[in-house]
């Protein structure tokens, strides 16, 4: 996929801010490039990152039999979480080749490779047949859709 200028700006943002995510978000262990969800059970920022995934998964009623599209998967954090926590199959797509490679490595390290598949693709212009997925997951990534209606 040849990135457009708009896509390249998104890719560049994450490349430039990667060190901040590594430091503040403990990216190497959390795989999260999103904010957390705080309630009375959460005691740390790290827990809040996991809680965000839990709340979204419960709200979406994701089941082990579901096929999930993680639209804007970053380094694979939510995809890996869903595969581990629920056991569903997840396809994660990102604009960034660097994030793709990190997601593949992260999935390998967490032993969820059979359940996850990562690709470089624009979530507003996929090549997936209609109705390929039961759930479309977008944790703090949909804001980057150039055309929200097309998304």
Residue ranges and their predicted role:
Residues 144-151:
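A short, conserved alpha-helix within the catalytic core of class I
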Residues 67-69, 75-125:
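Class I SAM-dependent methyltransferase SAM/SAH-binding core
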Residues 124-135:
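A short acidic, Gly/Pro-enriched loop at the edge of an enzyme's catalytic core
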């Amino acid at each position: 996929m040849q990135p457009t200028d708009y896509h390249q700006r998104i890719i560049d943002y994450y490349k430039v801010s990667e060190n901040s995510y590594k430091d503040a978000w403990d990216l190497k262990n959390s795989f999260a490039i999103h904010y957390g969800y705080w309630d009375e059970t959460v005691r740390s920022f790290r827990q809040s990152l996991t809680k965000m995934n839990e709340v979204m998964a419960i709200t979406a009623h994701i089941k082990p039999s579901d096929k999930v599209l993680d639209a804007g998967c970053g380094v694979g954090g939510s995809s890996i979480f869903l595969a581990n926590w629920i056991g569903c199959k997840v396809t994660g797509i990102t604009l960034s080749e660097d994030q793709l490679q990190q997601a593949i490595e992260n999935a390998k390290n967490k032993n969820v490779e059979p359940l996850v598949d990562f690709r470089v693709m624009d979530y507003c212009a996929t090549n997936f047949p209609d109705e390929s997925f039961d759930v479309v997951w977008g944790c703090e990534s949909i804001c980057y859709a150039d055309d929200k209606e097309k998304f």
